[in-house]
C-alpha cells in the first residue's frame, strides 16, 4: 500500500494573509493579538510588532493589554515605517490600528502580497459609533475579520460600542474605564440621550 507523505512545509512560497481583530474598548482585542503572536513565536516564526507612538497609556514601547499582559514592540509615527522595518519577517502584528494613517491599508496589502502574515487589532468605531481611521479599509481587504465584544457595564449584555463619559469632541482621546465604558446598543442610546426634565406648569 502506498502512502502519500504530507509536506509540512507546504510550498516553498510563503502565503501571506491579513487578519483583523476589531471591536469596542475592553473587548479583548489586544489580548487576542498577543495570543496569536505568541503562538507564532512558539512556532519559531520571526515576528515584528508595531504600535502608534501616540499609544503611551501603559508603556512607551511595549504593546500592553488592559490585563497588563505585554510584549515588546516598535512604536512608529506612520504606516510607511512599518514596511521599512518589516524585512525578512514571517508575521507582523499591529495594535491600535485606528490611530494610524490611511496608508496602513496599502502597507498591509503589500506585506501580505510579499508572503507576510499580518495580524491587526483596532477599534472599528469611535465614541460616536463612526468608522475609525483605516479600520474600514483594513476590514475590507482582510482574509479574516474577528469581531470581539466587551460586556455592557449597564446591563451585562454583549457590548459593541465605546461610550465616552468625559467631555470632548476630538476623535482621539486616550483613556480607560474612567473615561470610556463598553455599552450595548440599547444602553448606548439611553446614555447618549439628553436627560429628560420634567416640565413644570405654573398655575395662576
Swiss-Prot record:
Q: Which keywords does this Swiss-Prot/TrEMBL entry list?
A: ATP-binding, Cytoplasm, DNA synthesis, Kinase, Metal-binding, Nucleotide-binding, Transferase, Zinc
Superkingdom of the source species: Bacteria
Please state where this protein is localized. Answer: Cytoplasm
Q: Which residues form the active site?
A: 96 (proton acceptor)
* Molecular function terms from GO: ATP binding; thymidine kinase activity; zinc ion binding
Spell out the InterPro entries in the cross-references: P-loop_NTPase (IPR027417), Thymidine_kinase (IPR001267)
Q: Which Gene3D superfamilies match?
A: 3.30.60.20, P-loop containing nucleotide triphosphate hydrolases
What sort of enzyme, by top EC class, is this?
Answer: transferase
UniProt-annotated binding residues for ATP: 23-30, 95-98
- An example Gene Ontology biological process: thymidine metabolic process
Question: Which Enzyme Commission number(s) are listed?
Answer: 2.7.1.21
For the ligand (Zn(2+)), the binding residues are 152, 155, 184, 187
Sorted alphabetically, which HAMAP family does this protein's record hold?
Thymidine_kinase (MF_00124)
The record's comment on protein family reads: Belongs to the thymidine kinase family.
Name recorded for this polypeptide: Thymidine kinase
Q: Quote the gene name from the UniProt entry.
A: tdk
